[in-house]
Amino acid sequence: MVRAVTEKNQERALELYYDLLTLKEPPMRILFLLAKQYRQLLQVKQFGAAGLAQTEMASKLGVPTFAVRNIVSCARAYSISELEQAVRDFVDAEESVKTGRLEDKLSVELLIIKYSSKKAAG
């Protein structure tokens, strides 16, 4: 599902999200996984701008080099500023749920819709 979001495949992302909910996956866990992926996308984008090789990126992120290749591929669809905004949005969503401003399922669904949209997020 995370990959469907980062690849901007909204229909698939929502379908998989609803499947996860049916399987009783907690929405906050899904939010955590999405936030983690977007943080990695941002870090890889920043590392690339700094001229780091993918092997160095893998070492800094603590993931295998093949995983970095996948992250780099997904990161191409975003600018650094879009990824920074996404990370802020995920933090804000978590805060909204924890303070009771938004229900957890809705909060995650809204983020999936926003970031899997083909038009520019933000």
Where are these regions (language model features)?
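Small-residue-rich helix-loop
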Residues: 1-82, 119-120
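Short coil/turn segments at secondary-structure boundaries
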Residues: 4, 47-49, 87-88, 102-106
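Acidic-residue sensor for enzyme active/binding pockets
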Residues: 25, 94, 109
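Short alpha-helical scaffolding segments that buttress acidic/His motifs in well-ordered protein cores
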Residues: 31-34, 87-90, 112
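Residues that form generic nucleotide/phosphate-binding pockets
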Residues: 60, 74, 89, 111, ...
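C-terminal capping/gating helix-and-loop segments adjacent to ligand/active sites or protein-protein/ligand interfaces
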Residues: 71-102
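Short, charged, intrinsically disordered terminal tails
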Residues: 101-122
